[in-house]
């Protein structure tokens, strides 16, 4: 399943990020990809050795960790270190699949269950640059407002179309979920959403408490901690 997570960053935060990123050192984006991806990748990324990068990636982690909808959809166990990329002048990233495992500075290795893109450019400011994701439900084309994030299974083939006008800037990361299986994770997300909707409409009740008990028992049964 694919999820749109709105408002991860406020407009003020986005403007500040963009101001900092205009001063950043950018390097060839192929430095962080494998052999297959390097053949179709043509973009730039912020140099991860810079102090500016360290500060910005911490802010992204804090923002997603504090976003209730992100947590409910991803049920994250481990988040990768966020990276930042830039596309301009017809730069693109052809169809590829993300690696199943990635190195992690604290945990050694992590499994990539979900991929996330946090948009930092207003969609009207550039042409092209759509994230195209192929999954079992078909093809999805994504171009979200700045500050919004999209979550999708890392097992999906995906690409970024050429940016023919303007500049597309984004942050991206991977998530190892407590729930490995996409279908089980989607069911928990739907159940959680319905519980929250019922609570807001009717308040607390024995029936809602029973559903909440079911949610946590399923999470206990399926989670990998």
Swiss-Prot record:
EC annotation from Swiss-Prot or TrEMBL: 1.14.11.-
Biological process, per Gene Ontology: DNA damage response; intracellular iron ion homeostasis
Domain Fe2OG dioxygenase: 78-177
Pfam families: 2OG-FeII_Oxy_3, PKHD_C
Residues involved in Fe cation binding: 96, 98, 158
GO molecular function, one term: iron ion binding
SMART domains: P4Hc
Cofactor note (record): Binds 1 Fe(2+) ion per subunit.
Domain of life of the native organism: Bacteria
Binding positions (2-oxoglutarate): 168
Required cofactor(s): Fe(2+); L-ascorbate
Keywords from the named record: Dioxygenase, Iron, Metal-binding, Oxidoreductase, Vitamin C
Protein name: PKHD-type hydroxylase YbiX
Native source organism of the sequence: Escherichia coli O81 (strain ED1a)
